[in-house]
């Protein structure tokens, strides 16, 4: 195998064995999948609201503004928007049900916590992507 050996220069050896670039790239792919799962969960939940003939009141701005959590507010708005033209929800607007199932009413809080975790992870990954990982640092 008459291969010529290469001469590794400063920083190149570490670049071959250092995993920060791979880990950051893998984190980006995982973040994208996580985002997709969260959006799908919100969409599926809006279908569940229709399937249980529930009200959109728990997803109103007035209720979501009672708590200061970004993720919860966004989930409420997303589900409320998804159901804004729902004929099923509109047909049960005046029903005599006292309350919808708790599992429906707490969707914004549960999904919102996951969205807040996503935003934290997104910030961390963006910080890593924009950070120096060279060793040694040459100025």
Regions found by a protein language model. Give the residues of each.
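Active-site cavity-forming subdomains of large catalytic enzyme subunits
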Residues: 1-69
């Amino acid at each position: 195998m008459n291969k010529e050996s290469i001469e590794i220069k400063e920083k190149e050896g570490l670049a071959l064995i250092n995993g920060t670039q791979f880990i950051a790239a893998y984190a980006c792919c995982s973040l994208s999948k996580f985002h997709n799962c969260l959006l799908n969960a919100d969409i599926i939940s809006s279908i569940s609201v229709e399937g249980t003939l529930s009200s959109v009141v728990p997803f109103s701005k007035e209720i979501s503004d009672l708590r200061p959590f970004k993720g919860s507010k966004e989930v409420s708005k997303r589900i409320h928007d998804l159901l804004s033209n729902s004929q099923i929800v509109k047909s049960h607007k005046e029903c005599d049900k006292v309350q919808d199932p708790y599992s429906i009413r707490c969707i914004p809080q549960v999904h919102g916590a996951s969205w807040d975790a996503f935003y934290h992870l997104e910030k961390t990954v963006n910080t890593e992507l924009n950070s120096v990982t060279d060793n040694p640092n040459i100025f």
